[in-house]
Amino acid sequence: MLRNLKKTLVLDSSVFIQGIDIEGYTTPSVVEEIKDRESKIFLESLISAGKVKIAEPSKESIDRIIQVAKETGEVNELSKADIEVLALAYELKGEIFSDDYNVQNIASLLGLRFRTLKRGIKKVIKWRYVCIGCGRKFSTLPPGGVCPDCGSKVKLIPRKR
């Protein structure tokens, strides 16, 4: 259904928090993510004016984003809103407007363009989880973020090339 739309911007919450008057699409989770009163009013005014439309990405697009996020080690770093923004942009072949480095990283891997309010990423990074105690490496975050071998905290670090 959404595939026939022209190329457009898919907006993350940072756009509304910064008060950028812009046209594009966002997702239900981004709307839920906006908590402060001023940003909420601003977003509602853009929706009322028809400048911002709310759309939900397909399950297939969401599954693709989760797959790529698992490959990069960033799946636990993404919020539901981040995943939806990436999935909607993937589905629409649109451009993402976000300051989130994890979102930018995955967008780059998928060949999606992105815009930022601040400085964006310089290179794509793949991540892994490593125990700070014993150095054991994990592809996903262990339960509770704790190493099952030594009980130390597990941190996300960039993979070496």
UniProtKB/Swiss-Prot annotation:
EC identifiers of the protein: 3.1.-.-
Amino-acid positions noted as binding Zn(2+) in the UniProt annotation, renumbered to this chain: C131, C134, C147, C150
Instruction: Describe the location of the PINc domain by residue ranges.
Output: 7-105
For this UniProt record, give its keywords in alphabetical order, as a comma-separated list. Answer: Endonuclease, Hydrolase, Manganese, Metal-binding, Nuclease, Ribosome biogenesis, RNA-binding, rRNA-binding, Toxin-antitoxin system, Zinc
The impact of changing D12N is: No cleavage of pre-16S-rRNA
Q: Which cofactor does it need?
A: Mn(2+); Zn(2+)
UniProt-listed Pfam families: PIN_6
- Which intervals of the chain are annotated as region Zinc ribbon? 126-161
Q: How is the cofactor bound?
A: Manganese; magnesium does not support nuclease activity. Binds 1 zinc ion per subunit.
Q: Where are the transmembrane segments?
A: none
Origin: domain of life? Archaea
> Which parts of the sequence are annotated with region: Flexible linker?
120-125
Q: Which is a Gene Ontology cellular component entry for this protein?
A: preribosome, small subunit precursor
UniProt cross-references to SUPFAM superfamilies, sorted A to Z? PIN domain-like
Family membership, please give it: Belongs to the PINc/VapC protein family.
Q: What is this protein called?
A: Endoribonuclease Nob1
What is the protein's species of origin?
Pyrococcus horikoshii (strain ATCC 700860 / DSM 12428 / JCM 9974 / NBRC 100139 / OT-3)
